[in-house]
Curated annotation (Swiss-Prot):
Cofactor note: Binds 1 pyruvoyl group covalently per subunit.
Keywords: Decarboxylase, Lipid biosynthesis, Lipid metabolism, Lyase, Membrane, Mitochondrion, Mitochondrion inner membrane, Phospholipid biosynthesis, Phospholipid metabolism, Pyruvate, Transit peptide, Transmembrane, Transmembrane helix, Zymogen
The name this protein goes by in its record: Phosphatidylserine decarboxylase proenzyme 1, mitochondrial
Deleted gene: phenotype: Results in an almost complete loss of mitochondrial phosphatidylserine decarboxylase activity.
Annotated transmembrane regions: 111-129
Active site: 236 (charge relay system), 366 (charge relay system), 515 (charge relay system), 515 (schiff-base intermediate with substrate)
Modified residues (Pyruvic acid (Ser)): 515
């Protein structure tokens, strides 16, 4: 007989019947009733006909499961992850092989090109270094090289700091929108502690760029000059070091010194190649200078004070002739000459002082006393940072860095003032020197016309040759030679003083952002500094006196 319950599985029917048979059995002691016999099978059938789904095991709960959002997949990623219905095993394997081959070819080409570039860069630098040594006729010296104490300082010394400083200078020259100027300068003042009440121009929007704001002027009443002081501070800043120069060595930090000859230069030069034409002095000024020279007999010259050519020369010197920008006024010459005429007959010695200018300080420097500068030496060098940390760790820092040494004399003898460049401070400006250019790749026109290396052997002068080829080659722009010194005189500023007179508190020049000013001078043994290390100074404040 065919089974009519076609829609029911046989196993379910069997289990149902088996369950009914077991339920129909009456246990011992249970009373028999028709109601129980009818109700129990109906409940069993209703319960057993419900399909039991298999239980899915519950996963362990992760506390961080719902705290992070999963990144949404792009359509391209979804298409790549969705498997294709057509499984082409051979084509997929071929594509993988092709991609790996392309990757290997790219890596091999990249490594080959990079290695070739590194080798060519090294060869070019080697040739360039040899050419510089050949042109400057310098011998390497271990005492005037970078000696970092750690790998971090060594890595710092290899950075292109001069190029970075030039880029920073270009950035500072960008003209800012008017609406952005005042907030930018106020933010800079807040960061570096600039006192905006001292600025001579109260309207900050008139500073077109950051360079003008860095080189800002201040109100004269905010920096009174101590007239009675023997010497005043040339700039705002912090005193790093001061004292007496012993055995020709200046103490940079405790246990670290550098030579005064290396700082100021020690080579004697020939006469200038040319002099700049100026108007003749007034007869009154000429007579006053002649009377002053006859009565006081000024005989101080730079060569007599710091000596002639030394045994170890670390710079090649380029003579630039006379670079006086303008002639001195009669009143200024009279004031300075009267002060210099008071010569002291006491025993003398050399003193030094180092003042560091922070980025928030006033960036111009002034004359610390009445003196005459007769010679300028521009030393082309590096632009390492002159922050106190680097002064304690980098030996010969002030010798390595680019600097301008103003050499001259005052009433006690030799006097010099050295503005030292630093990172992002490549531009040093001297108000009365029209041809001074610092942190430049190429020589200026005045350098090319008047400069020639001084040496013991006779050199061929350009004006002695009339060949057009030589004239054409000499007119080309030359690169500035590293570790060289470009020298100029200020003799035409005054016929009697033979230099540029500078009165106490007179502005000399300035630099951008922050740097260091070094003073080296001769004074009697009774001279005493009124300073302390890490002392904050203001321009015009007393720093020394005679006791």
């Amino acid at each position: 007989m065919p089974n009519r319950s076609f829609g029911v599985f046989p196993s379910v029917i069997y289990e149902t019947r088996l369950g009914l048979s077991h339920q129909m059995r009456r246990p011992i002691g249970q009373p028999l009733s028709k109601l129980s016999q009818v109700s129990q099978p109906n409940q069993i059938l209703q319960r057993n006909y419900q399909y039991k789904f298999p239980r899915i095991p519950r996963p362990k709960r992760n506390v961080l499961y719902y705290t992070f959002k999963r990144p949404q997949l792009s359509s391209a990623t979804i298409l790549r992850t969705v498997p294709s219905k057509i499984r082409n095993f051979s084509s997929r394997a071929k594509s993988k092989v092709k991609s790996s081959g392309r990757r290997r070819k790219f890596m091999s080409r990249w490594l080959a090109l990079s290695s070739i570039s590194v080798v060519l860069y090294g060869v070019v630098n080697k040739i360039k270094h040899k050419g510089i040594q050949r042109n400057s006729s310098l011998e390497p010296d271990e005492n005037h090289s970078v000696k970092p104490n750690s790998w971090t300082l060594y890595a710092y010394s290899t950075l292109p700091l001069k190029a970075i400083s030039r880029v920073w200078g270009q950035f500072n020259s960008f003209e800012l929108p008017i609406w952005l100027r005042s907030p930018s300068y106020k933010f800079y003042a807040y960061v570096f502690g600039v006192n905006l009440d001292e600025v001579a121009e109260p309207d900050l929007s008139k500073f077109r760029n950051l360079g003008e704001f860095f080189y800002r002027t201040i109100k004269p009443e905010t920096r009174p000059i101590d007239i009675d002081a023997e010497m005043v501070s040339p700039c705002d800043g912090k005193v790093l070091k001061f004292g007496i120069i012993e055995n020709g060595e200046i103490e940079q930090v405790k246990g670290m010194t550098y030579s005064i000859n290396a700082l100021l230069g020690q080579q004697k030069l020939a006469a200038p190649v040319h002099r700049i034409n100026y108007q003749l002095d007034d007869d009154d000024v000429v007579r006053r200078h002649e009377e002053f020279a006859r009565l006081n007999g000024i005989s101080y010259t730079i060569d007599d004070i710091i000596g002639g050519r030394g045994e170890n020369i670390h710079h090649s010197y380029m003579n630039q002739g006379d670079q006086s920008l303008r002639k001195s006024s009669a009143s200024q010459v009279y004031e300075v000459s009267n002060d210099i005429a008071k010569k002291s007959s006491f025993d003398k010695q050399l003193y030094f002082a180092v003042i560091y200018l922070a980025p928030g300080d006033y960036h111009r420097f002034h004359s610390p006393s009445n003196w005459v500068t007769t010679l300028r030496r521009h030393f082309v060098g590096e632009l390492f940072s002159v922050a106190p940390f680097f002064q304690k760790t980098l030996q010969n820092l002030f010798i390595l860095n680019e600097r301008v040494a103003l050499l001259g004399y005052w009433k006690h003898g030799f006097f010099s003032m050295i503005p030292v460049g630093a990172t992002n401070v490549g531009s040093i400006k001297i108000n009365f020197d029209k041809d001074l250019v610092t942190n430049s790749i190429y020589e200026s026109d005045s350098y090319a016309q008047t400069s020639f290396p001084s040496s013991d052997t006779s050199s061929c002068r350009e004006e002695d040759e009339s060949t057009p080829l030589i004239k054409r080659s000499s007119s080309r722009t030359k690169k500035v030679i590293k570790n060289s010194c470009y020298e100029a005189t200020y003799a035409n500023a005054s016929k009697i003083l033979r230099g540029q007179p500078l009165s106490k508190g007179q502005e000399i020049g300035g630099f951008k952002l922050g740097s260091t000013v070094v003073l080296v001078f001769e004074a009697p043994k009774t001279f005493h500094f009124t300073l302390a290390e890490n002392m904050k100074l203001k321009m015009g404040q007393r720093i020394g006196e005679l006791r």
